[in-house]
Design a protein with these regions (language model features):
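Extracytosolic ligand-binding ectodomains
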Residues: 1-389
């Protein structure tokens, strides 16, 4: 290992070691190593000399995860953290279930949850419900949605429709786009730019032949406008981050969607990019994600330990390690049962509070963040307990 400490220690927790399944080789090896580093840092900071962590390479494939799980079980693992990908978690499920070993996967694909597999990734449905509830609290009533074509886009569209209904709002327009395509035509149609521009031209034509004061005042008001009227939504949800939101945001401004009249909304997919405020069209946009307050300290400590900045997902491995250590009774025996994992009071980590549900999905306390030029700022604090949630 290249880390400053070894997580494979002698002893163990009641003779029940915890297996960590990560892609340490293959296409996701850099991310896998970062998650391993985060897990090591958690153990180092806790200072628990009696904890045994067994590390296995999944090679970033379902077949590799299956082999790793079999080896972990044969080595006596009583609890599995990982694997990272949904297909890998699906491959591990029957192997772990056969011997009654529970799994906490770092995937956010809730389709693989259940039957002993708990997904620990940030679930988009919950984020969408949180940000749409915030939009309702801010007195928005009509939501537009831009989502990619595909399974993820279908899922977030369905989630947004349900969330809007529950919040008493209406999804008034849905736009879908192909990943990697030129988005100009899609955004122009979604913004109803042509019809709004035609409305402006028609209004100017109607006023051109009039000389009364009201007509003159109206013409002055229309000066400098590109379109007339607003699009059919007062908030716009774009549940995709990375290059997609950076490509979409300036096009929204180009096609005259005024951020002062249409609130831009997002999800934790935006949380990978702390420099979103560099894009002027995104300043003032809001999204639902774990509070960054505790994670900021984690990021600093990680960088001090390992001399590189952690990827966003690294905190999942850190918190999962804290979870594994916490699942012990006062008698130092491990309780990795489904009942212990489903503790209604939940757990806490650098990404805030979380708990697992009976179906293997997770629930988190999410904050509302606002994009600023200096970086994201907490607008609405994340809950500190699940009381009332």
């Amino acid at each position: 290992m290249t880390s400053p400490f070894d997580i494979n220690r002698p002893g163990g927790v009641g003779g029940d070691p915890v297996a960590l399944l990560l892609p340490l080789t293959g296409r996701a090896s850099v991310l896998g190593q970062a998650l391993l580093d985060a897990a090591q840092m958690a153990l180092f900071e806790i200072g628990d000399e009696g904890f045994t962590f067994l590390v296995y390479d999944t090679q970033g494939t379902a077949a590799g995860a299956e082999d790793a799980a079999r080896l972990a079980i044969s080595d006596g693992a009583a609890f599995i953290l990982g694997p990272l990908f949904g297909q890998s978690a699906q491959a591990v499920k029957p192997i772990a279930a056969t011997v009654g070993v529970n799994v906490v996967s770092f995937s956010n694909n809730d389709a693989v949850s259940g039957e002993g597999v708990n997904v620990f990734g940030l679930l988009p449905d919950e984020q969408i419900h949180r940000i749409i509830a915030h939009a309702a609290a801010e007195r928005h009533s009509r939501i537009g949605l831009l989502a990619p074509v595909g399974i993820y886009g279908d899922r977030v569209t369905d989630a947004a429709i349900v969330a809007a209904q529950q919040a008493g709002l209406e999804i008034t327009k849905v736009g879908r786009y192909e990943l990697g395509e030129d988005l100009s035509d899609t955004i122009r149609v979604f913004a109803e730019y042509n019809s709004r521009r035609s409305s402006l031209a028609y209004q100017r034509k109607q006023l051109a032949g009039r000389s009364d004061e009201i007509a003159k005042q109206t013409m002055r008001r229309l000066e400098g406008l590109e379109t007339l009227g607003d699009p059919p939504y007062d908030a716009l949800l774009v549940p995709e981050g990375g290059a997609a939101i950076r490509n979409i945001a300036p096009l929204l401004a180009f096609y005259d969607i005024d951020p002062k009249r249409v609130q831009l909304l997002g999800t934790a997919a935006w949380d990978d990019d702390a420099s979103l405020g560099d894009e002027p069209a995104l300043v003032g946009a809001r999204y639902a994600a774990p509070s960054p307050i505790l994670r900021h300290g984690f990021d600093q400590r990680f960088k001090q330990f390992f001399k590189y900045a952690p990827p966003r997902l690294a905190s999942l491995a850190y918190d999962a390690t804290l979870l594994a250590v916490s699942l012990r009774t006062a008698g130092e025996t491990a309780d990795f049962s489904a009942e212990a994992l489903a503790d209604a009071a939940g757990f806490a980590g650098v990404d805030g509070i979380f708990r697992f549900l009976a179906n293997g999905q997770n629930q988190r306390g999410l904050a509302i963040l606002e994009v600023r030029e200096s970086g994201p700022e907490v607008l609405v604090a994340a809950p500190e307990s699940f009381a009332g949630l």
